[in-house]
C-alpha cells in the first residue's frame, strides 16, 4: 500500500470509502464539501469516478475519515502523484492531471 510522509498508513482506506466520500461530495456539491472538510480545490490531480471529476486530495482525506473515524486536514498529507493521487491510483481509481485533463503520468 502507498504511504505518505505524515499519515503512517493508508491501509484502512478501501475503494468503498472513496466511493462514500464521492457520494457525500455529490450530495453537498463541491463548494460545501470542501468547506465542510477544510480543503481547497485540487491544483494538480483529479479523481475520475463514474465520468465525474473530484478533488483528489479532499476525497482521500474524507475517505480516510470514513475508514478510521479520524479526520485529516489538507496539511496532514500531500496531494501529489506520490501522495493522494498515488494512493487513489493504487486503489484502482483513475487520476487525471488537471492541467491537461488527461490521465496522470
Predicted region positions:
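Intrinsically disordered, charged low-complexity linkers and terminal tails
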Residues: 1-105
Amino acid at each position: 500500500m502507498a504511504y505518505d510522509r505524515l499519515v503512517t498508513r493508508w491501509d484502512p482506506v478501501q475503494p468503498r470509502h472513496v466511493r462514500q466520500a464521492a457520494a457525500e461530495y455529490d450530495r453537498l456539491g463541491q463548494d460545501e464539501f470542501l468547506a465542510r472538510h477544510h480543503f481547497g480545490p485540487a491544483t494538480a490531480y483529479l479523481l475520475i469516478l463514474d465520468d465525474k471529476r473530484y478533488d483528489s486530495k479532499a476525497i482521500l482525506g474524507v475517505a480516510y475519515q470514513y475508514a478510521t473515524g479520524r479526520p485529516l486536514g489538507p496539511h496532514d498529507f500531500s496531494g501529489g502523484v506520490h501522495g493522494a493521487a498515488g494512493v487513489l491510483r493504487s486503489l484502482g481509481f483513475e487520476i487525471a492531471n488537471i492541467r491537461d485533463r488527461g490521465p496522470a503520468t
